[in-house]
């Protein structure tokens, strides 16, 4: 019943705002983001640049090495450095993903064999960002600038992340961040009300510019891992020859989980 009420409220809100208004706002955000990211030399937007689409942009980021940044490390950096949550993967669109990424049948079968052996991390994919009609101009600029900044210098942070070949997940070297609230911290009081530790810290939108400035300063302070012609390949007994043959993303030696 509760989920039906929530669904009804969603549709009521949509009708109150108006489909035309939603479409106009989202189309405006989408066109501006597509133009800016489309002009960036390290961002490849997937799909037709002219076909009508929803306000979701799927993209991959190239590295100075000639490879790509793994989509999940892009997702991790956006989350950890900017507090932006996006999704990475192939959007449950395997055959279409093959077309978008130019993977032929032979290559697909090679990926399938490696994934079936337990190496989920080799699976190709992309990151995707959505622009909802209700975001402000400041939030829109923050999203666009954060992705552009990662495309500019995100590769510098990759050595500070640990990659799991089994899952394809990347975690910062400092370890897993504790969640704000755990299930075992939630209680029902004597009156039957749910209680839990509250953390209601909120920053104004004016802080977003400061976050971008701090991120730029961090990137500028990091050494370039590709300076001096460092080797692109990783020699590690846990990675098969097939994995190395298929590897399409940067994987510094420091990034392998121990």
Tell what function each PLM region has.
Residues 1-9:
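PLP-dependent aminotransferase class I/II
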Residues 2, 14-25, 29-47, 54-258:
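Non-catalytic terminal extensions of PLP-dependent enzymes
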């Amino acid at each position: 019943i509760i989920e039906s009420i929530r669904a009804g409220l969603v549709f009521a809100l949509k009708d109150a705002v108006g489909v035309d208004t939603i479409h106009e706002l989202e189309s405006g955000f989408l066109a501006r983001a597509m133009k800016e990211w489309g002009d960036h030399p390290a961002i490849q937007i997937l799909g037709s640049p002219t076909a009508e689409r929803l306000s979701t942009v799927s993209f991959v980021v190239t590295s100075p090495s000639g490879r790509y940044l793994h989509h999940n490390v892009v997702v991790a950096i956006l989350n950890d450095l900017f507090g932006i949550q996006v999704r990475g993967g192939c959007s449950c669109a395997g055959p279409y993903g093959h077309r978008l990424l130019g993977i032929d049948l032979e290559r697909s079968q090679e990926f399938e064999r490696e994934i079936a052996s337990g190496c989920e991390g080799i699976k190709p994919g992309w990151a995707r960002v959505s622009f909802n009609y209700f975001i402000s101009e400041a939030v829109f600029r923050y999203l666009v600038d954060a992705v552009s900044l990662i495309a500019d210098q995100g590769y510098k942070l990759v050595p500070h992340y640990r990659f799991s070949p089994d899952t394809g997940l990347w975690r910062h070297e400092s370890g897993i961040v504790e969640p704000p609230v755990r299930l075992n911290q939630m209680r029902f009081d004597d009156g039957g009300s749910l209680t839990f530790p509250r953390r209601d810290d909120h920053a104004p939108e004016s802080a977003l510019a400061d976050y971008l400035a701090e991120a730029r300063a961090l990137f500028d302070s990091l050494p370039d891992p590709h300076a001096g012609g460092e080797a692109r390949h990783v020699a590690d007994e846990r990675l098969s020859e097939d994995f190395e043959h298929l590897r399409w993303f940067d994987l510094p030696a420091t990034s392998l989980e121990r």
